[in-house]
Amino acid sequence: MNRIGILSRSDGSSEWKQGSARVICGVNGPIDVKIRDERLNKATVEVLVQPVSGVAETLEKMISSRIVGILEDAIFLNTYPRTLIQVSIQIIEEDGTDTLAAVINGAVLALLDAGISLKYIPCAINCHWKNKITQDEPDVDGTINKLESIITICYSISSEPAKLIFLETAGPIPEEDFFRVLETAPLHAEEVSKKMKELLFETYNESDGHENEKNPKEDVEMDVVA
């Protein structure tokens, strides 16, 4: 289940499930920043990603670097000069295919819960493309070989039409199918944005003591198979 405001020691927090991935995100800030990291006219954004078990390694550091760039562009950094906005992300479940999109959306929800001002809402989706010609050919060890391309796409959602801000692919995909994915992806990203807004509205309505008149919250399915 997708939730916000779940961590009592964070200014904002979220639990977000997307496909095979589930993450818990916490935001603290704006808080004091170390002098060496201080930026005179804007905030510093720090993202820490922890794996399901063990310590952060290359993959988690790679995810962190990607998330920092996305969040720095979305946040009104000049509103919080000489401060730190710290985003901590714990991966609870994953199989490596949906993690990046889940982390992006979970972090954005936690920022919104913390009241951080955003220029727009970044919304990420995953597209899984399978090579239909070879997907049933067994590997040498007898397992089924399913060649798959995983495409993570992030759009900025605001009053303007959705704008592509991030795209990453893992694995080959024919050009025709790739552009077909790009044609439909903005609609799915806008659906993610709608689900986020509904979750925020429902949660704060409940916290104010108002009866929730909407349907029960459901996990958001954002995988688009092209």
Curated annotation (Swiss-Prot):
Keywords in alphabetical order: Cytoplasm, Exosome, Nucleus, RNA-binding, rRNA processing
UniProt GO BP: exonucleolytic trimming to generate mature 3'-end of 5.8S rRNA from tricistronic rRNA transcript (SSU-rRNA, 5.8S rRNA, LSU-rRNA); nonfunctional rRNA decay; nuclear mRNA surveillance; nuclear polyadenylation-dependent mRNA catabolic process; nuclear polyadenylation-dependent rRNA catabolic process; nuclear-transcribed mRNA catabolic process, 3'-5' exonucleolytic nonsense-mediated decay; nuclear-transcribed mRNA catabolic process, non-stop decay; poly(A)-dependent snoRNA 3'-end processing
Main location: cytoplasm
GO molecular function: 3'-5'-RNA exonuclease activity; RNA binding
Residue ranges, annotated region (Disordered): 205-226
Localization (cell): Cytoplasm; Nucleus, Nucleolus
Oxidoreductase keyword on record: no
Annotated Gene Ontology cellular component terms: cytoplasmic exosome (RNase complex); cytosol; exosome (RNase complex); nuclear exosome (RNase complex); nucleolus; nucleus
Domain of life per record: Eukaryota
Bias (Basic and acidic residues) ranges: 207-219
Assembly and interaction partners: Component of the RNA exosome complex. Specifically part of the catalytically inactive RNA exosome core complex (Exo-9) which may associate with the catalytic subunits rrp6 and dis3 in cytoplasmic- and nuclear-specific RNA exosome complex forms. Exo-9 is formed by a hexameric base ring of RNase PH domain-containing subunits and a cap ring consisting of csl4, rrp4 and rrp40.
Function of the protein: Non-catalytic component of the RNA exosome complex which has 3'->5' exoribonuclease activity and participates in a multitude of cellular RNA processing and degradation events. In the nucleus, the RNA exosome complex is involved in proper maturation of stable RNA species such as rRNA, snRNA and snoRNA, in the elimination of RNA processing by-products and non-coding 'pervasive' transcripts, such as antisense RNA species and cryptic unstable transcripts (CUTs), and of mRNAs with processing defects, thereby limiting or excluding their export to the cytoplasm.
Descriptive protein name: Exosome complex component rrp46
Lineage, highest ranks first: Eukaryota, Fungi, Dikarya, Ascomycota, Taphrinomycotina
Record gene name: rrp46
